[in-house]
Amino acid sequence: MTAADPDDIAKQAREHAWNWFALHATQRMQALNFFVVATAFLIAAYASILEKHPAAAAVLALAGAWLTFWFNRLDARSYQLVEAGEDALRVSQARLASLADNQSLMILDALDEPAPGASSYRRVITVIQSTIFALFLLGALYAIRLSLM
């Protein structure tokens, strides 16, 4: 039995880490896109039934808030999976930077903190989802108020 080539193992590790990262980062953006589209449909439905059926609009708004909550939880998990891929890629980047004698190849380490004035994806997604959650709740309260008049 021959010993495994360390360079081959390092290459396999890098490919595995990259595939993991790419899969979960793509899924995260697709989930966000689906959330935005679903939110647009819910808002359109809410607006179209609000005047004639305010109780139904309230239920729809509460369903939107509920879905927003769960999309936020799903994004938190996706964030964790993406971070796991980044952690694995850091090792490959450190090895590559050392072999190439080029510390600029440690890209993830250089980008740990967003630039001044920039925000992380996690922060932006959370702010968007929190705002939509609050708007759905306010919409539900407004529809309930209309239904009681």
What are these regions (language model features)?
Residues 106-149:
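A hydrophobic membrane-anchoring alpha-helix module
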Residues 26, 30, 51-58, 119-126:
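Membrane-water interface of alpha-helical transmembrane segments
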Residues 31, 53-108:
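Inner-leaflet juxtamembrane helices
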